[in-house]
């Protein structure tokens, strides 16, 4: 592997101007392309501290054997050159928004004498109008099948068209009136082209005019007593309305825009794009990409910039030869692109996109109204796509087996870790400190073995020590394991579960070297030597192993796209989720505790009944004993105890001896009353 010092540029030789650079491997292949406002500052960052780079970036620098750069005049030129080089060289270390398939579009061949409708994939061609993309080819066929009863345009291939012209007999679609049969002269070329033009107008959003014209024709046919034609027009209008229902209006102002949203984690990011034309969603696309791991290249701003550059660069190339005819629905670059955040290069991106479009393009972050609501919908789609991607990868048996084998090989374990346990600590400024323990067996969660822990020794009075908390939870978990192993007969007799009798093959803690060393020290004290311990740091691919001799070893680096790292990520995330849920529950219980908690015999159910009956504690304080006893399950004694707990003096029970001062007050009151004139 090349040494970066052998190809590092000489000091002062790198220009400070903006430009684009590329790293090459020993075989001369380009492995990474980047751009920078200052080439010197950016390139020096790759060589200043190799150990401080993200693992993926460090691997790139160690793989490369040379670096070269090109100075440009503006950042717009840098954007264009970066895109061209990524497209040309396909560097392995760059983020690429590759499709796992080619998305289909609906093509209308206006360049033919008798235009036809067809499903199409590939580069755009001159004289052809395109609608889409669609997520599935069947969605195009369904739309065409619905609309050809209204607009009976040709859908057959050139060979089929020629054959039916020779035999002078239309195909089945011609017989059922879903094709105007220009092949046998049922309509002229001009009439058929008008049918196709109306079809295109409908898909382009000019629906109101077409429906209004058909309604006028239907009314005229009815007045002429041509009820058969009126019924056919009525059915056609219904078919058009059903087609419109499939594309619900999402932006009432008829906006043409692409709405982009992201969902990401430490390793990957999912992006979704909704194509809105004429206020309706005309298409949708999605990708899941691997993140580089470099902090500056994992931000949402960077992901947005890279996506806009690559996606619209590719779209412009596909649409470069097409004849949009000024039609907004066919233009690959819309007037607006709605994004979650604006990158630093927003001005340059707008200029570049405007050049691709041929008119102004605006990047916007939706703040309110329909656009904001649609952006949230697209984001939910991105989150769902990322979750589905992760579940699909984790749920596959082959992938799970590969993940366990990957962990075994990378950690040097004797056997595959069939049982993995992970602990995580959760608290807010030292209060309500709790821990979770989750269990995965054969790569799948075993939720019946999950456990919560309330931290006792390492927390309290607003203090929290994560390292000590890790040690406490580890001690309690494995102390229970040893006890269950020593008392199997008693445990079975009492009917208790043997959940803690099974030790994990791999014990994972959330943290770095201090946390993992604390857990290992506890296992050593307990004499447990057959459990491997690791720690997961914030950089997920850095896996820490115990080292109790005081030195600071380098972490084990997992490949970012390995199945083993995916499984460890799922285990860590599940432990974090479980700890957070318990912490929130405990904090909520503490914060909502009231004076009613101290009333003996008043359980949670009756406390809720009291608050529900009176609406609030304030109204409960104003209630009398008799009013409180109206609540089911509350007696007079409990009602008095409730008032006492709320600081309200309750009247004495009937027959009880009144205090002396109370009696004197009553006598005075009686004397006063006796002197009131009758």
From Swiss-Prot:
A biological process (GO) of this protein is:
nucleotide-excision repair
The Low complexity compositionally biased stretches are 649-667
Q: Name one GO cellular component term.
A: excinuclease repair complex
State the source organism's domain of life: Bacteria
**Keywords for this entry?**
Cytoplasm, DNA damage, DNA excision, DNA repair, Excision nuclease, SOS response
Chief subcellular location equals cytoplasm
What is a GO molecular function of this protein?
Answer: excinuclease ABC activity
What sequence ranges are listed for the domain GIY-YIG? Answer: 16-95
UniProt-annotated location(s): Cytoplasm
* Region described as Disordered: spans on this chain: 649-678
Indicate the segments forming the UVR domain, all copies.
Answer: 208-243
Q: Say what the protein does.
A: The UvrABC repair system catalyzes the recognition and processing of DNA lesions. UvrC both incises the 5' and 3' sides of the lesion. The N-terminal half is responsible for the 3' incision and the C-terminal half is responsible for the 5' incision.
Tell me which family the UniProt entry assigns to this protein.
Belongs to the UvrC family.
Assembly and oligomerization: Interacts with UvrB in an incision complex.
Q: What name does this protein carry?
A: UvrABC system protein C
- Tell me the organism: Mycolicibacterium gilvum (strain PYR-GCK)
Originating gene: uvrC
């Amino acid at each position: 592997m090349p040494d970066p010092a052998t190809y590092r540029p000489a000091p002062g030789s790198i220009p400070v101007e903006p430009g684009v650079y590329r790293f090459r491997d020993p075989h001369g292949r380009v492995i990474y392309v980047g751009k920078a406002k200052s080439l010197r500052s950016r390139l020096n960052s790759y060589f200043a501290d190799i150990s401080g780079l993200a693992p993926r970036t460090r691997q790139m620098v160690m793989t490369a054997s040379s670096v070269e750069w090109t100075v440009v005049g503006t950042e717009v030129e840098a954007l264009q050159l970066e895109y061209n080089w990524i497209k040309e060289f396909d560097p392995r270390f760059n983020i690429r928004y590759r499709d796992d398939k080619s998305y289909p579009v609906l093509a209308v061949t206006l360049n033919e004498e008798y235009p036809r409708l067809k499903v199409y994939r590939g580069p755009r061609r001159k004289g052809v109008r395109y609608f889409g993309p669609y997520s599935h080819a069947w969605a195009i066929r369904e739309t065409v099948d619905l609309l050809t009863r209204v607009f009976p345009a040709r859908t057959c291939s050139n060979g089929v068209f020629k054959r039916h012209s020779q035999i002078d007999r239309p195909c089945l679609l011609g017989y059922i009136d879903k094709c105007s049969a220009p092949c046998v002269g049922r309509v002229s070329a001009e009439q058929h082209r008008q049918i196709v033009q109306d079809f295109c107008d409908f898909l382009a959003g000019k629906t109101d005019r077409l429906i209004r014209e058909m309604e006028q024709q239907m009314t005229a046919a009815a007045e002429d007593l041509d009820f058969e034609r009126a019924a056919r027009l009525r059915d056609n209008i219904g078919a058009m309305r059903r087609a419109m229902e499939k594309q619900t209006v999402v932006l009432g102002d008829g906006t043409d825009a692409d709405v982009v949203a992201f969902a990401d984690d430490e390793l990957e990011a999912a992006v979704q794009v909704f194509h809105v034309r004429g206020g309706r969603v005309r298409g949708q696309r999605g990708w899941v990409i691997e993140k580089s791991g470099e902090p500056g290249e994992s931000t949402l701003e960077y992901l947005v910039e890279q996506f806009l550059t690559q996606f619209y660069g590719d779209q412009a190339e596909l649409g470069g030869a097409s004849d949009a005819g000024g039609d907004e629905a066919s233009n690959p670059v819309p007037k607006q692109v709605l994004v979650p955040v604006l990158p630093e290069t927003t001005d340059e991106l707008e200029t570049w996109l405007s050049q691709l479009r041929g008119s102004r393009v605006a990047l916007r972050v939706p703040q309110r109204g329909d656009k904001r609501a649609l952006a949230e919908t697209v984001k939910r789609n991105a989150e769902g796509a990322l979750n589905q991607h992760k579940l699909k990868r984790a749920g596959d048996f082959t992938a799970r087996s590969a993940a366990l084998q990957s962990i075994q090989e990378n950690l040097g374990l004797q056997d595959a870790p069939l049982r993995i346990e992970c602990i995580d600590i959760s608290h807010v400024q030292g209060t309500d400190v709790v821990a979770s323990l989750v269990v995965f067996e054969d790569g799948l969660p075993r939720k019946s073995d999950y456990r919560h822990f309330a931290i006792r020794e390492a927390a309290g009075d607003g203090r929290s020590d994560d390292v000590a908390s890790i040690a406490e939870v580890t001690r309690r978990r494995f102390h229970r394991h040893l006890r269950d192993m020593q008392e199997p007969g008693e445990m079975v007799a009492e009917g208790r579960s043997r959940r803690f009798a099974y030790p994990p093959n791999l014990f994972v803690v959330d943290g770095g070297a201090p946390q993992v060393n604390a857990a290992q020290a506890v296992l050593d004290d307990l004499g447990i030597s057959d459990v491997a311990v690791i720690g997961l740091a914030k950089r997920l691919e850095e896996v820490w192993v115990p080292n109790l001799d005081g030195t600071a070893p380098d972490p084990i680096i997992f490949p970012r796209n390995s199945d083993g790292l995916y499984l460890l990520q799922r285990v860590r995330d599940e432990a974090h989720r479980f700890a957070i849920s318990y912490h929130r529950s405990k904090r909520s219980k503490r914060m909502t505790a009231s004076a009613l908690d101290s009333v003996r015999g008043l359980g949670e159910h009756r406390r809720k009944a009291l608050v529900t009956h009176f609406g609030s504690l304030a109204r409960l304080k104003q209630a009398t004993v008799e009013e409180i006893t109206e609540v089911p399950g509350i007696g007079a004694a409990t009602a008095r105890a409730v008032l006492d707990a709320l600081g309200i003096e309750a009247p004495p029970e009937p027959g009880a001896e009144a205090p002396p001062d109370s009696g004197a007050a009553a006598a005075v009151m009686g004397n006063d009353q006796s002197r009131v004139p009758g």
